[in-house]
């Protein structure tokens, strides 16, 4: 095992302690030799002896070095306990956040704090403690996001990092109590600054505990579900319990998360306003910087409130416009949401009989390109026969979600006048709905959607190759590939995001001669095998790429697929353009 920073910190801490002890003994011997103190130090003269020792600059330097080494050792020990080794990107973000926090929070203190030794030591300790708590909190959130995106993370690994948030919260609450004691003892308004930032960190930590606590609970439930194999009825009730938990998770994350977010912003605003009140209005550069910070915080608060109101209105409009799925439909389909891959206790039913969570469906509809809204599973258009003015309305004060709700309501009313319904139940003809399929291509070349694992009607669980959850996993995978070394096609296929075509498998195992592959203009090129020239494979892979990147022109997708013959490599290349 190599030497780490923790081992070096232990050694330097031991050396500083030995140095401080040796210097203290030498100083006491010198004071005894001069007759300033007696040989036996009692409780009565201990205060005088301590003052004599601290009068030496060497003693103060050694004591400060020992305290600093103790602090570094404690931080490194906690880092090793909760996080282990840090990734390079985590270290870089940590340094950037630390510098920004010191600049934004510590720069204004000299303008309002009295310039004495006691005040300097007190506010230095305050800033150091808050920086430590803030960095551990940010590091825990980043690592939890990384574990949430990793398919190999376990509940124990997640809980190990999650417990760091409990450590931050408990330490922060103790620091708030200590700050209140100092403020009540001294009574000066300057010491009120001790409270704003710790309260803001507490609210941020509570929000992180709320969000990632549900993630940990979901991971633990899924881990137990993999181990236990019960009967179909028990499986249904378990899915209903998980679906109810998901509904509560969305409700709490939306409402309580908004409250905690607003409380954090209000604490930051109060911190800057109190500094401005203590400093006074002098029209200096400091006042201009404070004004800009306050203006940015006020803008963030107003934007957050408007966003929350719009979200509530949008969810209410969609909830009233879409039909609720009955418990019989949920039991018959034994379904999970094709967007978030979670069970459903409550669901909304589209006209094609596919079921989704309300929030997931809204997120999907928000990504509609040029307002061409379709079912996430079967790609049937949600609105048929719209005029051009309806397809591109002048928005004004009407939000896109209200516009969607009106279209759903108009379609629901028109369904009662039709005998066969708005959407037929037979398999849709994708060669007619997609404009890029109108070229003169032999219909026998085209692979059906059933070969790609996509169900047409009924259960949406069959469409695991499409849907927002798989697209997010693909993006996370590409991000991890970008940070590390280049992966092969077999590594890409091991994720199981899309079914691997035989042509792709043959391409992965094809020998690449020297100079045939490589990079050209920043794009990853793969040798195209003879079997990859099959138009059916190209069309099937193009469909998959269009699920991830619907805004990319079809010609560019075809050109890159002809070079790479790989869905993952093509998506990676198009993202680099």
From Swiss-Prot:
GO terms for biological process: plant-type hypersensitive response; protein ubiquitination. Its main location: membrane. Disruption phenotype: No visible phenotype. Residues 537-577 form the CUE domain. The chain crosses the membrane at residues 3-23, 58-78, 120-140, 162-182, 191-211, 272-292. GO terms for cellular component: plasma membrane. GO terms for molecular function: transferase activity; ubiquitin binding; zinc ion binding. This is E3 ubiquitin protein ligase RIN3. The lineage of its organism: Eukaryota, Viridiplantae, Streptophyta, Embryophyta, Tracheophyta. The gene is RIN3.
């Amino acid at each position: 095992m190599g030497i780490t920073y923790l081992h070096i910190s232990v050694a330097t801490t031991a050396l500083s302690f030995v140095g401080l002890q040796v210097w203290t003994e030498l100083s006491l011997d010198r004071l005894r030799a001069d007759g300033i103190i007696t040989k036996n130090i009692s409780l009565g003269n201990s205060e005088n002896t301590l003052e004599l020792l601290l009068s030496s600059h060497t003693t103060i330097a050694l004591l400060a070095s020992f305290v600093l080494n103790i602090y570094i050792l404690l931080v490194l020990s906690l880092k090793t306990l909760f996080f282990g080794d840090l990734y390079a990107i985590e270290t870089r973000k940590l340094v950037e956040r630390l510098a920004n926090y010191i600049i934004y929070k510590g720069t204004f203190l000299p303008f309002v704090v009295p310039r004495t030794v006691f005040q300097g030591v007190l506010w230095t300790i305050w800033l150091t403690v808050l920086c430590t708590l803030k960095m551990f909190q940010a590091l825990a959130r980043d690592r939890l996001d990384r574990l949430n995106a990793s398919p190999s993370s376990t509940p124990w690994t997640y809980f190990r990092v999650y417990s760091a948030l409990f450590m931050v919260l408990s330490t922060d609450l103790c620091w708030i109590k200590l700050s209140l004691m100092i403020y009540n003892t001294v009574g000066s308004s300057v010491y009120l600054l001790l409270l704003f930032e710790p309260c803001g960190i507490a609210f941020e930590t509570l929000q992180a505990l709320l969000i990632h606590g549900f993630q940990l609970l979901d991971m633990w439930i899924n881990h137990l579900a993999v181990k236990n194999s019960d009967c179909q009825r028990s499986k249904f009730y378990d899915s209903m319990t998980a679906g109810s938990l998901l509904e509560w998770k969305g409700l709490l994350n939306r409402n309580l998360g908004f409250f905690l977010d607003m409380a954090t912003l209000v604490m930051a605003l109060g911190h800057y306003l109190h500094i401005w009140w203590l400093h006074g209005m002098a029209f200096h550069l400091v006042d201009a910087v404070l004004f800009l910070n306050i203006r940015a915080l006020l803008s963030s608060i107003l934007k957050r409130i408007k966003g929350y109101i719009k979200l509530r209105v949008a969810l209410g409009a969609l909830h009233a416009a879409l039909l609720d799925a009955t418990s019989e439909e949920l039991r018959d389909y034994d379904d999970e949401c094709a967007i978030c891959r979670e069970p459903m206790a409550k669901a909304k039913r589209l006209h094609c009989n596919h079921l989704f969570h309300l929030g997931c469906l809204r997120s999907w509809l928000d990504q509609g390109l040029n307002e061409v809204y379709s079912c996430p599973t079967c790609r049937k258009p949600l609105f048929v026969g719209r005029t051009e003015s309806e397809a591109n309305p002048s928005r004004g004060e009407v939000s896109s979600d209200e516009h969607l709700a009106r279209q759903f309501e108009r379609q629901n009313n028109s369904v009662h006048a039709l005998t066969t319904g708005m959407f037929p139940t037979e398999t849709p003809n994708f060669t007619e709905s997609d404009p890029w399929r109108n070229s003169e291509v032999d219909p026998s070349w085209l692979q059906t959607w059933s070969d790609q694992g996509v169900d047409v009607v009924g259960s949406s669980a069959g469409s695991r190759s499409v849907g927002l959850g798989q697209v997010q996993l693909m993006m996370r995978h590409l991000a991890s590939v970008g940070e590390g070394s280049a992966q092969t096609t077999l590594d890409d296929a091991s994720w199981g995001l899309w079914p691997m075509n035989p042509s792709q498998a043959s391409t992965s195992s094809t020998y690449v001669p020297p100079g045939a592959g490589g990079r050209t203009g920043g794009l990853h090129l793969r040798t195209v095998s003879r079997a990859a020239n099959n138009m059916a494979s190209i069309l099937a892979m193009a469909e998959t790429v269009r699920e991830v990147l619907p805004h990319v022109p079809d010609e560019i997708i075809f050109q890159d697929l002809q070079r790479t013959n790989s869905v993952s490599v093509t998506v990676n290349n198009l993202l680099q353009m």
